[in-house]
Amino acid sequence: MKKKLLSLLFLVATLALTGCGYKKPEVHSMLGMNIKSITTVCGTDCSMDTIDTSSTSDHGMITYYYTDVAGDKGISDAKTYYNYLKSEKHCIKIDDFDEKKGNYSAYFQLNEKQVKSGFLMKVSFTKNSYTVYIEDNI
């Protein structure tokens, strides 16, 4: 009995630490991107471990935030990333916003052949920071 209780406790602790086996997705593979593309947009210090994950609805929607404060370099990287997404055949730009010097946002959605509906990406940047938001139904 004691052994079963310890086994159960170990299982619960393992699930708590691993998020019930759910791993943060490798975004570059979801978009058909190579790792260099993600490294570029995140800056040198960004890794999958530094992405904040938060629930945004009761339906299992998860939002991933990639944020970096990098001044002009950050703007350059964000524009590169935006242009990359715009050029990808399986990324559809579904909305964009006021384009100003140093301030731009756009929403991208993968076409239905690549992923189920509900996947949305937003790229935004200002003079001091840039953020990539990714929402994914799990």
What function would you assign to each model-found segment?
Residues L6-V12:
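Sec-dependent N-terminal signal peptides
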Residues G21-I138:
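An acidic-aromatic pocket/loop used at catalytic or ligand-binding sites
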Residues M1-L5:
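Positively charged n-region of N-terminal signal peptides that target proteins for export
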Residues A16-G19:
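C-terminal motif of bacterial Sec signal peptides marking the signal peptidase cleavage site
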